[in-house]
Structure formats: C-alpha cells, structure tokens
Amino acid sequence: MTQPSPTHALPRRTATFILLLAGAGGTLAAPFEIAVSPSRFELSGRGGTRLGQSLEIHNLAPVATEVTVRTIDWHYSAEGQISYHDDLQPGSCRPWVALERRSVQLPARGSRAYRFQIEPPAGSPRGECRFMIAIEGSEPAQQALIQGGGASLSLPVTGRIAVAVYLALDGAEPRLDLQRIASTDSGGQRRIAVTVANTGDAHGRLEGSLEAVDSQGRAFALVPEGTPILPGQTRTLALMPQAEDGRAAPQPAYPVKAEGTLDWAQGSFKVEATLE
C-alpha cells in the first residue's frame, strides 16, 4: 500500500470504542477483548484525491489474537434502527476503499496501527460517502473463508466492532432544522425529545445540553442522543436527563423548564421551553 496522504477531519468527540457481541450459536474460541480508536471518522475531500487514514486496534486480552478486517455498508433509519449489509448497496462507495490487509495479528495487551485509503473517482458528485470498517474475531474454522473473501455476516463470530467512516465530498454538509421540543410517552414512561430535520447532503448530530429544573426544584441537564441524522431524514431524538456528576438523573417531575443551546456542526439552536 502506498503512503497515506494528508486528510482533513471535521470536529468529532473524543474517541471511544463499542464492543458489539454477535454470537450466533456455537462456543466461543476465546474472549473477544478488542478496543478500537477513534470510534468514527468524519473526513472531507474531493473527487480524484486519495485520502489516507489509520486506526488503532488494541488487544486487551493477556494472549495474542488475530482479527479480520473488512468493509460493510450500513443504514441508520429515522426510527433509530441500524442495519448492516455485506452485499454492496445501491450507491455504495466501498469500491473506493483500499484496506491494508485482511487480517491483523495482535500481541497480548498490545496494539497495531491499521491503515486504509479512500479514493473517490474524479468527477464524483457532491455528497457523503458512508461505510463501516468491521473488525471481527471469528471461530478458527471460519478464518479461511474470511481470508478468502467468502465470509458473510451470517457466519458465527465471537465479536465485532464497527467503525463508521463519513467522507463529505466537495463541501457536502448538513442543514439541520429544530422543528419541535416536547414531552412524549414512550414505553409507558414520559420522556423529553426534539424533532430535527436534515435537508443537507451530509449527516449531522446534535451536541451541547440544556439546563433544566423540574416541578420539585431539582436541577439537571438534558443531553441530546448523539446518533446521526442522515441527509433527508427527520428524526425525533431523546433528551436524556443527566445529573451534575454525569450519571443518569431521576425521572423528572413535570412540568419541566428547560433552556440553553443545542449545537451542530454549522450552527446552534437556542431553546427556552416549559414541558408539561
């Protein structure tokens, strides 16, 4: 693989990792104790320009292990459901992606840098390329299939970490509009939520928090759900009560008064509301 070229990354939160267990029957050959950073990539570029990036794969286990790496397509619905697709989906940009290798050997309690490149063809239209890099631990019997390119998401795996990659081409950006803030009933419990529309051509997210006080005088923060709002979507996102120490706050007593600012990449929304 050639040396990666510089990239331009949009602001993002501190990197964390998510372990998604995906056992589908059978016994586990070994614990899947892997961490990956960053948790996602938010990049910008243009057609005809190669972008290089790297992630760190950390083995937290006291024994050496091997993981496999591949790309997958994904979709996040307006209702908040994520789906993964091994087959190329319409408009997929995965053919633009070159991975350093199919598998990585990790030493006990050690780390490896893993490189990948994205090369959008010249003349690619403005928009957002989205895919995930899947780092998987698998049963030994499945290693040959994966390395031979014959793996599918239906194979039993001991674990998977999926790292989202977003590439905004030729200035693609979100355009968010906060349409509503209200209290609603969900699963028999009251919650506070905001409805946000994205009329842009790249994904967006809400950040920031609101200061809130309930009818019993208890103060807490309301923090927006940090999941993506894809282009063309209108999503209702929960505002989660959070205590000063960062832990979940008790269920508030209504009415609740809330004020403050919710931020997104290109702006912010000033909020002042009484929620019954």
Identify what each model region corresponds to.
Residues 72-74, 119-166, 245-276:
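Terminal connector regions
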Residues 52-56, 100-105, 110-122, 127-132:
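Ligand-binding face of N-terminal immunoglobulin V-set domains in extracellular IgSF glycoproteins
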Residues 2-17:
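Bacterial N-terminal signal peptides that target proteins for export
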Residues 31-38, 62-116, 207, 214-219:
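Surface-exposed binding patches on compact interaction domains or structured appendages
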Residues 30-65, 101-105, 174-193, 226:
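Beta-sheet-dominated interaction scaffolds and their linkers
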Residues 60-63, 82, 122, 197-202, ...:
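Short, acidic/polar linear motifs in exposed loop/turn regions
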Residues 104-111, 226-235:
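Short proline/glycine- and polar residue-rich coil/turn motifs
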